[in-house]
């Protein structure tokens, strides 16, 4: 025999006073993050909130640059969210990392494809995973390092995006080692030239202006030099 429905009076229903603010912050977070699957993302959001973990929330809205059907779905903003959630650990368990990836509504097959670049068993060094994610965002090694600087920097958005040269050189060597077209001698020569340029004026830090030169600027410089030659 089914049990009768339990009835509660208004005095028995306790609504925590902080609930309106929680829902307000949740709504703002959803608007900024624009998750592809709201239910999946919401589960990850409130799970992290209940544990006191960093939330899967972007710092700001992003213009979409890819679709999950044709590309990774990964964006600089989402990769930065993962970094906020994982950077306090030197190594991250793959099961935990995959769940965080899933909570950001990123395709599982792309997670596996990323790990195939540098296979591991149960865990991965976080800085290595971050480097692989940056390489997935950028077509070239320098573009990947640009994304790395923008994610790791303490400078305000739009600033020089400086990070320690030690971190930069580690990631550059790591990614270059995965690229069969880049020799170790080329890597070391390039890093040595960068270090020489920044040692006297950057206090061990490297920023975008030290290594990243957009194609547009290169073309303008080339045109200017040709004009001078004429």
Curated annotation (Swiss-Prot):
GO-annotated biological processes: flagellated sperm motility; regulation of protein phosphorylation; sperm capacitation
Domain of life: Eukaryota
Domain RIIa, chain residue ranges per copy: 17-54
Major site of localization recorded for this protein: other
UniProt subcellular location: Cell projection, Cilium, Flagellum; Cell projection, Cilium
Alphabetized UniProt keyword annotations: Cell projection, Cilium, Flagellum, Ubl conjugation
GO cellular component, one term: radial spoke
Record InterPro entries: ROP_DD
PTM: Sumoylated, sumoylation decreases upon spermatozoa capacitation conditions.
Annotated disulfide bonds: none
SUPFAM superfamilies found in the cross-reference section: Dimerization-anchoring domain of cAMP-dependent PK regulatory subunit
Function: Functions as part of axonemal radial spoke complexes that play an important part in the motility of sperm and cilia. Important for male fertility. With ROPN1, involved in fibrous sheath integrity and sperm motility, plays a role in PKA-dependent signaling processes required for spermatozoa capacitation.
Subunit structure of this chain's protein: Component of the axonemal radial spoke complex 1 (RS1), at least composed of spoke head proteins RSPH1, RSPH3, RSPH9 and the cilia-specific component RSPH4A or sperm-specific component RSPH6A, spoke stalk proteins RSPH14, DNAJB13, DYDC1, ROPN1L and NME5, and the anchor protein IQUB. May interact with AKAP3. Interacts with FSCB; the interaction increases upon spermatozoa capacitation conditions. Interacts with CFAP61.
Family: Belongs to the ropporin family.
Record protein name field: Ropporin-1-like protein
Organism: Macaca fascicularis (Crab-eating macaque)
Organism phylogeny: Eukaryota, Metazoa, Chordata, Craniata, Vertebrata
Gene name in the database record: ROPN1L
């Amino acid at each position: 025999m089914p049990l009768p429905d339990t009835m509660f009076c208004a005095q028995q229903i306790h609504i925590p006073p902080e609930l309106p603010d929680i829902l307000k912050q949740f709504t703002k977070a959803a608007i900024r993050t624009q998750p592809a699957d709201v239910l999946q993302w919401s589960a990850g959001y409130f799970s992290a909130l209940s544990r006191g973990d960093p939330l899967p929330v972007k710092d700001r809205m992003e213009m979409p640059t890819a679709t999950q059907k044709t590309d990774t779905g990964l964006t600089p903003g989402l990769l930065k969210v993962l970094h906020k959630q994982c950077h306090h650990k030197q190594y991250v368990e793959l099961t935990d990392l995959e769940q965080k990836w899933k909570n950001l509504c990123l395709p599982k097959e792309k997670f596996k494809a990323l790990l195939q670049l540098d296979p591991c068993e149960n865990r991965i060094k976080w800085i290595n995973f971050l480097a692989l994610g940056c390489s997935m965002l950028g077509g070239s090694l320098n573009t990947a390092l640009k994304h790395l600087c923008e994610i790791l920097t303490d400078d305000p958005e739009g600033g020089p995006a400086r990070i320690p040269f030690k971190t930069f050189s580690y990631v550059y060597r790591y990614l270059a080692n995965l690229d069969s077209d880049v020799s170790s001698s080329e890597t070391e020569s390039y890093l040595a030239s960068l270090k020489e340029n920044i040692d006297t004026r950057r206090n061990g830090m490297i920023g975008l202006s030290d290594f990243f030169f957009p194609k547009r600027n290169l073309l303008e410089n080339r045109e200017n030099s040709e004009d001078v030659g004429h």
